[in-house]
């Protein structure tokens, strides 16, 4: 699983801040106890000192360290018993002064072996939702709130009615999100504006990110401007753009919205092919939303890209009346 560096930094920062807050709360608890019973502070200091004595005895040359270590151990145990007695007199459990990690799996380091611990993964998922919420209304949008009633049930000359087609798209998107694995599938959502493409994209982003995968959502126009900045600039803007390009290339799921609304140039054609082909080769998944049908995409971006889309993406056409306009007209 790939982690978004930007999101991981934010998650780690919050993780460390919460850890420091807990440590400060523990320090304050200790100070309150020491004010009630100064002897406890002295005992704590002596217990910490015995650890240094054991190390010094073990390193001392020319003598057998075991007898000295046994004496120090007995002293340490005696101090612990006295500490427990004093704490009990004050009404506290015997481990009240000990720093207890919130996560028993990693000891609050956030890592287990070479990977993230589940505790840090929770922070990562929360930060990713926050990052996606800056561009998508994922808080209120879910597969369960997708309203099929706005789509006509009349087939006319179509093999499916707009409502049947919307139901099919909903089922496919829900299944894509529920069974998501990087590189398993790619989706191309295409059709006129206002038919639910961005809504379903947001639903996919929400479910996949909550499952712990890295998700980047962006508009095609902004992505291509970042590609251009990374290629031609050498200032701070170029550095930031380069990081954004890496995020788009390496995330588990890229959701590329509004493809076709940008100014299409030869550079954009090249950047789009590089992005999509690179992600396919790396085993990463992509969801594309566009107002253009496959034939129009081929004319605008070239036959090689169209071949990639038709061969590697599941095509989901959206048909019907502009739902945003219908909602406005009905007040």
Model-predicted segments: where are they?
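Short, charged low-complexity linear segments at domain edges
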Residues: 69-104
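Pre-Walker A (pre-P-loop) alpha-helix and adjacent loop at the N terminus of AAA/AAA+ ATPase modules
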Residues: 139, 143-187
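Short, charge/polar-rich alpha-helical segments
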Residues: 2-14, 18-44
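Short glycine-rich substrate-engagement loop in P-loop NTPases that contacts/grips substrate
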Residues: 153-169, 187, 209-250, 266
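Interdomain "pre-motor" coupling segment immediately N-terminal to P-loop NTPase/helicase cores
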Residues: 90-141
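Loop/turn-to-beta-strand initiation segments
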Residues: 185, 213-214, 250-253, 282-288
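Walker A/P-loop nucleotide-binding motif
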Residues: 183-200
């Amino acid at each position: 699983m790939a982690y978004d560096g930007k999101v991981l930094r934010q998650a780690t920062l919050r993780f460390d801040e919460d850890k420091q807050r807990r440590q400060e709360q523990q320090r304050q608890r200790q100070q309150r106890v020491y004010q009630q019973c100064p002897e406890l502070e002295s005992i704590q200091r002596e217990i910490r000192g015995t650890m240094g004595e054991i190390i010094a005895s073990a390193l001392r040359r020319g003598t057998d360290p075991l007898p000295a270590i046994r004496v120090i151990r007995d002293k340490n145990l005696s101090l612990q018993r006295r500490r427990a007695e004093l704490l009990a007199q004050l009404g506290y459990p015997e481990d009240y002064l000990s720093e207890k990690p919130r996560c028993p799996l990693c000891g609050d380091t956030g890592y287990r072996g070479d990977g993230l611990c589940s505790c840090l993964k929770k922070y990562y998922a929360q930060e990713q939702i926050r990052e996606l919420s800056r561009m998508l209304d994922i808080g209120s949008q879910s597969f369960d709130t997708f309203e099929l009633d706005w789509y006509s049930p009349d087939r006319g000359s179509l093999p499916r009615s707009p409502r049947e087609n919307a139901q099919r798209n909903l089922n496919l998107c829900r299944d894509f999100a529920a069974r998501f694995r990087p590189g398993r599938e790619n989706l191309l959502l295409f059709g006129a504006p206002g038919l639910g493409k961005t809504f379903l994209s947001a639903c996919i982003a929400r479910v996949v990110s909550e499952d712990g995968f890295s998700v980047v959502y962006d508009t095609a126009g902004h992505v291509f401007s970042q590609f251009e900045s990374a290629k031609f600039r050498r200032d701070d803007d170029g550095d930031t753009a380069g990081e954004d390009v890496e995020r788009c290339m390496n995330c588990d799921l890229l959701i590329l919205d509004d493809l076709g609304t940008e100014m299409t140039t030869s550079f954009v054609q090249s950047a789009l092919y590089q992005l999509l082909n690179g992600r396919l080769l790396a085993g990463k998944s992509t969801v594309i939303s566009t107002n253009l049908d496959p034939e129009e995409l081929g004319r605008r971006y070239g036959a090689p890209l169209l071949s990639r889309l038709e061969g590697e993406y599941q095509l989901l056409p959206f048909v019907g009346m502009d739902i945003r306009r219908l909602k406005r007209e009905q007040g």
